[in-house]
């Protein structure tokens, strides 16, 4: 399944979740798009709820189905809770860490920065958004890319960095100090439904 590239606000309203992380999509119209949007949301079956939760998480991180399932299967081989491990693996993607550090305003912007070679991991350029960042690794910006408006503007407005990351705004450099705990990740997601979906 290809990555969704349509209007993110419309998709956010359909899923009932802010994919941009700002919440603006749902402020004025907290209902699904279309002529029947303002009415009650259709009651979903058990399968429908599981599918919707999977779609929420997949679109939140902006990954295609193949990448999503690959990480899900990888999480199954780890010790601990399957669903929590899956969430942690998604959060450790390089594009997501770039976003969480405040170097981009959205995950989509962060993915573009990585794709275009603007991001360094431990001083070396990495242009693979799905790269798994490990605890202790440092994420930075190439010298030639430090004046990009997309980066400067994002850093200026960002006022929150998760506790499992550190960030130096002057150096445009951050460290993935540890793996996040489940309580630090997407409280609006019920990952147990996603595990149930793939266990059918």
Curated annotation (Swiss-Prot):
CDD domains: S4. One of its GO terms (molecular function) is structural constituent of ribosome. One of the primary rRNA binding proteins, it binds directly to 16S rRNA where it nucleates assembly of the body of the 30S subunit. With S5 and S12 plays an important role in translational accuracy. InterPro entries: Ribosomal_uS4, Ribosomal_uS4_bac-type, Ribosomal_uS4_CS, Ribosomal_uS4_N, S4_RNA-bd, S4_RNA-bd_sf. This is Small ribosomal subunit protein uS4. It comes from Bacillus velezensis (strain DSM 23117 / BGSC 10A6 / LMG 26770 / FZB42) (Bacillus amyloliquefaciens subsp. plantarum). It holds the Pfam family Ribosomal_S4. GO terms for cellular component: small ribosomal subunit.
